[in-house]
Amino acid sequence: MKSWMAILLVMALIIFTLDNCYSTDDKPIGKCGDRQRNKLCLVCQDRSQIDYYYTECCIYDQTYYMCLDMLRH
């Protein structure tokens, strides 16, 4: 009986570990953990119609400042 419980415990641990490793949680890219920056980068991506603009805006400050300039004009 104890061996079955040990096997089940090990299987549960393996499944839990794999679930955390292959989780599909949408984590913010780069500096887009900040809500304001995230919203601005999304707006700039929509306006620019460039697929990778959001990622660039979240990672690079220069692209973020270009985004701010785009929204000012």
Swiss-Prot record:
Record flagged with keyword Secreted: yes
Disulfide bonds: 32-58, 41-57, 44-67
GO cellular component, one term: extracellular region
Main location as per UniProt: secreted
Keywords: Disulfide bond, Ion channel impairing toxin, Neurotoxin, Potassium channel impairing toxin, Secreted, Signal, Toxin, Voltage-gated potassium channel impairing toxin
Tissue: Expressed by the venom gland.
Cell compartment(s), UniProt: Secreted
Example GO molecular function: potassium channel regulator activity
Cleaved signal peptide residues: 1-23
Function comment: Inhibits voltage-gated potassium channels.
Protein family membership: Belongs to the scoloptoxin family.
Protein name, UniProt field: Kappa-scoloptoxin(03)-Ssm1c
